[in-house]
Amino acid sequence: MLRVCNEKDCHDIWVINREEMGYDVDFEIAQNHIINVLNDDSQRIFVYEVDGRVVGYIHAATYNLLYSDPMKTILGLAVLKKYRRNGIGGCLLLMVEDWASDSGAEAVQLSTGKDRDVAPIFYKAWGYDLRKEQYSFIKHFTDNYNA
């Protein structure tokens, strides 16, 4: 079942992030981040539930640029390995595309790591074009950043 995320989904999303994405973050921290997103109208989390358990999710946000109309950006998409190749990722992607279209967004954009070799194939199959390859820089202000 495809639906909007709620606070009860925090644990399942935390497990997916740990097992499938490699993000080892304390549950309480992850839960607080998810709740903050749920309370932010510029962001959405959609989940796919099977037998009462969230097996996949997508997180997207409004992406405002000074030189383009607003877009939505996908910040995360993950499906438990056992449930992959069953159309769940595509259903989640369509939820974001519908939200983007309904809100008047110009496009949906995303970035994916070069180490995620299946992701480019998936996104191209869903009509996404590779726009450019780029470097990603980050400067941390605390020592407890795990992603």
How would you name each of these model-derived features?
Residues 70-81, 135:
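Conserved acetyl-CoA binding element of GNAT-fold acetyltransferases
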Residues 5, 77-79, 112, 128:
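Hydrophobic adenine-recognition pocket in adenosine-nucleotide-binding enzymes
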Residues 109-119, 138, 142:
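Conserved beta-strand-loop-alpha-helix junction that forms the acyl-donor binding cleft
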Residues 1-8, 143-147:
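Conserved N-terminal entry element of GNAT/NAT acetyltransferase domains
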Residues 76-79, 85-98, 125:
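Conserved acetyl-CoA-binding loop-helix of GNAT-fold acetyltransferases
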